[in-house]
Amino acid sequence: MPRVISIVSGKGGVGKTTLVGNLGAILSKKFDKKVLLIDANITTPHLGQYMGVDFCQTTLNDVLRGKALVDEALYEHESGARLIPASIELHDLKGIDISKLKKVVAEANKKIKDTEIVLIDSAPGLGREAVASLKASKEVLFITTPYAPIVIDVMKCARIAEHLKLKPLGVVVNMSHGKGHELNKQEIEALVGLPVISTIRHHKEVHHSLSARKPLVLHRPRTQGAKEFYRLAEALMGVEQTNPGVLARLREIFNRFYSTTPKNTKKMQAQ
């Protein structure tokens, strides 16, 4: 059975979609994992746009309404990751029953038999969309910025995940500037009750990748921000990080000599 991981935040704008896109690209392209990304933020979806897959004919909305099969809403990204986007059209919110998300995820795992990891880009907060993502998952990774109001919201999300008996993977602190007015690692861990497994600093290159509609690890793989996403992916996969300097040099060599020309994004059917 594949790992099903929801990426959860208590507030929008903390980098949840950016995290999902970059992790998906790394796990697929570098770890050779069969990865499925699902945009479960139905009301304000961004994952498809971030990955360069938008204005799709068939989306998760159609599947939730029972008007399409799950494999009909499946698209392949240039990284090799598969993606089920949500519709950006306002009228496509009609007739959506988000409580069916768990059933859709189960159906996707049944039809796409080689999937190893499912990453769900959940809606922020504690509403029905966010809870539906949690209920469809087995594991949960929390993301926050280093400020008390947002960390407190994550604390609430963590309590719901605990109630649902989900496996917590820890907390990612995003957009850190390393300033004294920010909460530090120990303070965040004390509030949430979970370990901080990664701190990703604020990098302007992330904004460039947003404009390019491409994950940072593909758009600018040698940047410090990309390296931080790599280290997080390694932690999630249980890779030892005893000598990150060597890993960084190996990646640089790989990127220099073995980088490939991106494929066009294409729609695919389940195999």
Indicate where each model-derived feature is located:
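Short, conserved glycine- and acidic-residue-centered signature motifs
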Residues: 20, 97, 101, 150, ...
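C-terminal lobe/tail of nucleotide-utilizing enzymes
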Residues: 163-271
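Walker A/P-loop phosphate-binding motif and the immediately C-terminal alpha-helix
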Residues: 3-40
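Short coil/turn connectors at secondary-structure junctions
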Residues: 1-3, 31-33, 78-79, 113-115, ...
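P-loop/Walker-type NTP enzyme "switch/lid" segment
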Residues: 37-111, 210-212
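Conserved catalytic-core segment of NTP-binding enzymes
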Residues: 36, 103, 107-111, 117-208, ...
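Solvent-exposed alpha-helical segments within well-ordered globular domains of core cellular machineries
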Residues: 25, 45, 61-62, 72, ...
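Residue-level signature of catalytic and energy-coupling elements of molecular machines
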Residues: 12, 39, 63, 84, ...
